[in-house]
């Protein structure tokens, strides 16, 4: 007979991610039944995700209606290309390196210090938050870089204080127009002749190519006008997805995206299904269809060879195809799949990597009008977003998938509704952009809110019975191990008996981050009145010993985030309890 007077400890790490396909008896303690706006952390635990903020203070100009959404975004040649309505624009963005006070005088001789002046013209206008500045020169010879000859309060704006790291952006410059009825832009960056270029297709008009000076040239061949997909493979440009020939892939001669002379190496390939995406991976071009996947290998038109990967399952949407964790990930009819697993196992369910969150995909695949995806390389993270017409951004859902040593872990996103996306890595900096329905370009992984809207993080543990659901546990305390990055606005809730409404429901307990370890080079000076006191030698992953009330046959832990604090990681919990009577 156990000694019920002794306190029993039960500790677990936060690992395994969101699991919705197992009973409470089979779930591991570290797995979650709710994991919303938290992400499986590559450093262990569950991290409250970053927000996003405007990457440009200026709205992308509309063609005819304010309801026009962003239908294309890409980073190229130190600028961002944005597509809205019938036009394409570019602009430059950076961050403020040194704060500007409201009283600082700038009347033609001011200086603004920024992280980089790359992509900006040598003179022009800038916008920082709501204030417009003009400048007459730039300097990259100093660090931080500088805008010189600055005048503030331009265009009747008012001088204001601007903190470091806020966005500094140029106005938008039109670089192409007349793209009537453009639907959705997809692009490919390439270099065939020593000049970096980018090509766009929009499902309706002729493909357009920009060089690094942003000169626009339309591809003249009518056979590829209206293409939906484009990919560069073995120095040929491949086009597919025309509404009139949805099963055909057309490719150019080598090193020329606008020459389709068959005798010089151009040609076409027809498959027996509607094409939904193209993606180059290693030494092959993968052609995704509604119900098939094909693999093209070879180097020229004389030895190109097509082979089926599977003839029983396809890709629902080409915008979900991403190179991720050493494989190609795509959305199949039964959830997320990898090409390697699908090729090896065929169309069986074993090829699906998202079984743990299958119910989320089942609920969203059927009625989502559009899908978007991004890869965040430094987090080994794939994100897919389910966009539904008429649905508010605040309730738009998505899923994060993180590759860990033990396998894939998942969580749910709520509050991001992208209409176009791009991920670009430059000098180790991962730039994750998306366009929205309001005409703005946003940068993910920046800030603590969704462009001013709170990031509401939610965590719920599995139902913890400690091996025996028949014995009552009298809870004494919960020890929380977490890693804060700044002040925390979150609370712990303890619930009992599978959250039965008749069981004890103690009031919420606030998480305390008042004494966080100071890290040289990253911590700011703190004050006795501040929300966070950085303590030299203090713990960077503190243990909070929280006495709790109540008892039950099983215990549930919840963390509810207030929405505007900096991210933090939940690392693990220890629950201490005494045994009571058997039911």
Listing of model-derived features with the role each one plays in the protein:
Residues 1-93, 177-194, 303, 312-327, ...:
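Beta-sheet repeat architectures centered on beta-propellers
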Residues 55-63, 172-178, 215-221, 262-269, ...:
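A short beta-strand motif characteristic of beta-propeller blades
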Residues 62-66, 100-104, 218-227, 270-273:
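Surface-exposed ligand/attachment interfaces on beta-rich extracellular proteins
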Residues 85-86, 195, 203-204, 213, ...:
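Surface-exposed loop/turn positions within WD40 beta-propeller blades
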Residues 95-109, 115-185:
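Small/polar beta-strand repeat architecture
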Residues 225-257:
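Carboxylate/His-rich catalytic cores and anion/metal-binding grooves
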Residues 285-310:
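Surface-exposed extracellular loop regions of Gram-negative outer-membrane beta-barrel proteins
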């Amino acid at each position: 007979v156990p000694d019920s007077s002794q306190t029993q400890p039960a500790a677990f790490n936060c690992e395994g991610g969101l699991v919705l396909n197992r009973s409470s008896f089979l779930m591991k303690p570290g797995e979650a039944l709710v994991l919303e706006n938290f992400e499986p952390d590559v450093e262990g635990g569950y991290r409250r995700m970053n927000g996003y903020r405007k990457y440009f203070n200026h709205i992308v100009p509309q063609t005819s209606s304010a309801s026009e959404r962003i239908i294309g975004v890409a980073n190229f040649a130190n600028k961002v290309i944005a597509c809205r309505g019938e036009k394409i624009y570019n602009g430059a963005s950076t961050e403020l390196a040194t704060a500007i006070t409201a009283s600082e005088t700038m009347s033609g001789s001011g200086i603004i210090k920024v992280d980089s002046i790359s992509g900006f013209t040598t003179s022009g206008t800038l916008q920082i938050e709501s204030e417009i500045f003009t400048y007459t020169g730039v300097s990259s010879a100093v660090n931080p870089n500088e805008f010189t000859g600055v005048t503030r309060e331009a265009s009747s704006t008012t001088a204001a204080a601007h903190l470091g790291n806020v966005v500094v952006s140029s106005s938008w410059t039109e670089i192409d127009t007349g793209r009537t009825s453009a639907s959705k832009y997809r692009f490919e960056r390439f270099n065939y002749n020593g000049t970096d270029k980018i090509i766009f297709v929009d499902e309706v008009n002729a493909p357009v190519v920009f060089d690094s000076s942003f000169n626009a040239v339309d591809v003249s061949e009518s056979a590829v006008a209206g293409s939906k997909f484009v990919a560069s493979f073995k120095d040929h440009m491949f086009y597919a997805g025309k509404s009139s020939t949805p099963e055909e892939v057309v490719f150019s001669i080598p090193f020329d995206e606008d020459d389709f002379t068959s005798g010089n190496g151009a040609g076409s390939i027809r498959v027996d299904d509607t094409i939904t995406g193209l993606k180059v991976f290693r030494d092959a071009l993968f052609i995704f269809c509604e119900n098939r996947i094909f693999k093209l290998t070879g180097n020229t038109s004389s030895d190109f060879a097509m082979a089926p990967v599977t003839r029983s399952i396809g890709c629902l949407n080409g915008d979900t195809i991403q190179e991720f964790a050493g494989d190609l990930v795509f959305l199949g009819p039964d959830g997320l799949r990898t090409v390697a697993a699908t090729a090896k196992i065929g169309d069986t369910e074993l090829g699906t990597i998202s079984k743990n969150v299958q119910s989320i995909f089942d609920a969203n695949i059927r009625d989502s009008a559009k899908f978007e995806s991004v890869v965040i390389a430094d987090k080994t993270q794939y994100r897919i977003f389910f966009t539904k017409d008429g649905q508010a951004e605040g309730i738009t859902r998505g899923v994060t998938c993180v590759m860990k040593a033990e396998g894939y872990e998942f969580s749910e996103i709520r509050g991001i509704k992208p209409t176009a996306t791009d991920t670009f890595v430059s000098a180790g900096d991962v730039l994750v952009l998306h366009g929205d329905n309001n005409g703005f370009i946003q940068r993910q992984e920046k800030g603590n809110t969704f462009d001013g809207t709170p990031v509401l993080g939610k965590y719920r543990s599995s139902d913890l019975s400690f091996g025996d659901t028949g014995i009552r546990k009298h809870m004494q305390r919960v020890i929380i191990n977490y890693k804060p990055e700044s002040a925390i606005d979150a609370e712990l809730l303890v619930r009992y008996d599978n959250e039965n409404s008749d069981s004890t429901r103690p009031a919420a307990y606030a998480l305390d981050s008042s004494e966080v370890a100071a890290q040289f080079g990253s911590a700011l000076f703190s004050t006795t009145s501040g929300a966070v006191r950085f303590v030299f030698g203090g713990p960077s992953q503190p243990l909070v010993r929280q006495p709790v009330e109540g008892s039950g046959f099983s215990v549930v832990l919840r963390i509810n985030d207030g929405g505007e604090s900096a991210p933090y990681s939940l690392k693990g919990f220890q629950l201490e309890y005494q045994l009571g009577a058997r039911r």
